[in-house]
Amino acid sequence: MDFSIKGCDWSKGEAKGFLTGKSDCIVLGIFEAQTLSGAALDIDTATKGLISRVVKAGDMDGKRGKTLFLHEVSGIGASRVLLVGLGKQDAFNQKAYTDAVTAAWRALLSTKIVQVTFTLAQLPVDERSSDWGVRAAILALRNETYRFTQMKSKPEPASHTLKRVVFSVDPADEKAAKLAVKQAVALANGMDLTRDLGNLPGNVCTPTYLGNTAKKIAKDWGLKAEVLGLKQIQALNMGSFLSVARASVEPPQFIVLHYQGAAAKAAPVVLVGKGITFDTGGISLKPGEAMDEMKYDMCGAGSVLGTMRAVAEMGLKINVVAIVPTCENMPGGNATKPGDIVTSMKGLTIEVLNTDAEGRLILCDALTYAERFKPAAVIDVATLTGACVIALGAHNSGLFSKDDALAGELLDASREANDPAWRMPLDDEYQDQLKSNFADIANIGGRPAGAVTAACFLSRFTDSYPWAHLDIAGTAWKGGAAKGATGRPVPLLAQFLIDRAGQ
């Protein structure tokens, strides 16, 4: 799909090109109380009051998400006009904008329209410029057009015909909007990779498959990939990681992917993604209901790989290292048992009280491995705890960090990217729940504050660098009729790296 930018100040009568240019449809916003947006006012004048008459007749009340097509409109080059309800003008925020553009895309994609002129990006949203509106609109469109059909015997063809979108933006934002297009397309491509990896079944998306995916990203985008096998992992003394992998016939992989966009001596940001390609719970076996969704337990890994692809396509001036420990968590005669004690790469001994608390066991060795890069910051991403889903639901990812500056950067990025996160506590008092009578630390701390104690466990392995943990158990995929991976938190991570790179 082709996206282009055209500057226009509707208030200064600069709309001639939009009024006369050929297009299958021009998209206009209407607020409640019969208030026309700036572009709608100009089109209303050109059509001799048609938009006003439609609104006054009650055919378009401006309620958020409502849409109405007008056909064969005289006075403009477009063959159709799509009116989109924006809701109340004084409540027009990020969510209202996202709802409006999503409704617009759904209406457009249900037609045979090929080329669209899109004016909604110029709407005032929380004092943001129109380049932000362009990026959010492209991501909403790509979200609507995403389909996972590669496992079907007859993949479904695209049902829409949309090929080209022309965005009108404020003239002062034209340069930034062109960059926003590039970033949005790269980000959407990264999210699609993340979704594809998550949606693949566990018999296809194995640890080896993830390793090969990392190698392909490296080959396609000029990165460096290292994929360590069982013997190399053993040589690194990653006893905690290996304790999870031991009962599976699928060999574990330890993936390291390097992107160098800055000087070689510049400290990298390290992203660590949990890569459990299927989680049965091990000997602490999960209930059978909805266990199929445990193929999504590698979404932390998928989001890290998707972010690396997006960063490479954007060409960010920053160094980034991705680390993905990946394996299956299976029961079997060789499986780790509740009560077993294992030794981590750091040398800390861990009493495994529950084998279904395995994500932290593979992440802790990866966090220790990250020390060798002398990182500027380390962010781990994991579908770690059901407790986080209970606490935050499916809207906010859980953010844990003792570093206020790093946490602040991530929260700012989450707001800018419209990929929400909520900071959770990480007080030292919670560490007491992880005490073990027989080892240095237990891998669970009981039912109270389960998401917090999981993060506390990880924090024991992060003394050497600024660190944050994102628990995406509630946000990485949707269940039920809409079952599928979401691609989150790729937007948050990418925005954090964009901000760090100063781009």
UniProtKB/Swiss-Prot annotation:
It is found in: Cytoplasm. Mn(2+) 2 binds at K274, D279, D297, E358. The keyword Phosphoprotein does not apply. Its cofactor is Mn(2+). Binds 2 manganese ions per subunit. The active site is at K286, R360. It is an enzyme of class 3 (hydrolase). It catalyses: Release of an N-terminal amino acid, Xaa-|-Yaa-, in which Xaa is preferably Leu, but may be other amino acids including Pro although not Arg or Lys, and Yaa may be Pro. Amino acid amides and methyl esters are also readily hydrolyzed, but rates on arylamides are exceedingly low; Release of an N-terminal amino acid, preferentially leucine, but not glutamic or aspartic acids. Mn(2+) 1 binds at D279, D356, E358. GO terms for cellular component: cytoplasm. GO terms for molecular function: manganese ion binding; metalloaminopeptidase activity. The keyword Zinc does not apply. It holds the Pfam family Peptidase_M17. It comes from the Bacteria. GO terms for biological process: proteolysis. Belongs to the peptidase M17 family. HAMAP family: Cytosol_peptidase_M17. This is Probable cytosol aminopeptidase.
